Regions:
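C-terminal interaction segment
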Residues: 1-164
Length: 164
């Protein structure tokens, strides 16, 4: 649980350097993931603002996944602080129609410096990038999980109906 002056928040996932540079809170994440499956857009926007608009926070990016429960569509957004406000820097849509998955909006990129709060100083210290192939894999895993949940609900419904 991460807390500021007036409220606390548990992210769906979060990352940051083990040893941040001086002046940065080592317990506050630099990159946060928030996933909206049943949340309202206003709740998700509130979560993004919590991470990016407070004083003294290290969060450099918030990645949101908005999972459509009716259509095979996932929207990935990357938010960053800009002039002390949350600004959407990137929007990617992953959708599936007629067994064809489409990724629009390019690769999701989280910069090395956003995550570690310092420039890279070695060839292996690179940006984190999820291209079309990995985004498609992520979406496929989510959609398979959604299908399993639907099947489980139907099975429970049939079982409870047969008892009556």
């Amino acid at each position: 649980m991460f807390e500021d002056e007036d409220k606390g928040k548990q992210p769906d996932n979060a990352w940051g350097p083990r040893r941040p540079p001086p002046g940065h809170d080592r317990y506050w994440p630099t990159v946060v993931a928030e996933i909206a499956y049943s949340e309202t857009p206003s709740k998700l926007n509130s979560d993004v603002r919590f991470w990016l608009e407070g004083t003294g926070r290290n969060a450099q990016a918030v990645v949101t996944l908005i999972i459509d429960q009716k259509a095979l569509r996932i929207t990935v957004e990357k938010w960053q602080p800009q002039n002390s406000r949350a600004h959407r820097a990137q929007r990617i849509t992953i959708s599936k129609m007629n067994e064809q998955t489409t990724v629009e909006g390019g690769s999701l990129v989280v910069g090395f410096q956003e995550l570690f709060l310092r420039p890279s100083d070695a060839p292996k210290e690179t940006d984190f990038e999820l291209g079309d192939q990995r985004l498609t894999l992520l979406a496929t895993i989510i959609w398979e999980q959604q299908e399993q949940e639907r099947e489980l609900k139907e099975l429970k419904k049939k079982k409870s109906g047969s008892r009556n």
